Amino acid sequence: MRIQDFKVVYICPDHNEKYHARKVHMDTMLGELGFKDVVHFKSGSENYPRCLAKANIEILTKYMDVPILVLEDDVEFTGVDAFDYADGVDAIYFGLSRCASHPTNEINEGECVVSPFSDTQVRVYNMLGMHAILYVTPKFKRAVIAKFKTPIWHTDIAMSRIQPAFRIVANKIPSFFQSAKFNAPGHDDSCTLFTITTPKPPPSRVFKMPTNLRYV
């Protein structure tokens, strides 16, 4: 399949010159890529992460019964638009992150843990980053909504905590990455612009699958 086969919603507050430039970028990029069904979700001006959490809650609630590709407004396209759509997956990450979430603290912890899923995808268990995700199943959307309604700091850390309870996969080659053009000085594109080759656990610790997670 191709990413253009899905409705896409991108989140952008568009409340000042900086974010208006991002909106223009997203409209231009998605138009050039051939997306036919593009929605701009104008997020609120609350402090992060409440604004992003509320935006995702509203989007996932509205599009509960259809697969929906949600993008953040700081992404660029890598040139890869084809992917494998496997039955039974709850979500597909079209954007990668090298970073893993800490299991209890609001910090990252080394490289993310993945395991083989197919020739083109891996299963993820604690990957940070929410810049390009295809949400597929209602049960996963409901779990994300419930998680984001609780007090949180970083939304991607909150999201990572429920990944082991679902079948969440990531494409080994991303379609989108978070670009230095739209982020603070010192941002390194390679944090989200890379290819997953041989899945292996991070050297810092051995990942233990939580046994008390269950969502329906």
Give the positions of each predicted feature.
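An acidic/histidine-cluster motif and surrounding catalytic segment
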Residues: 1-71, 75-216
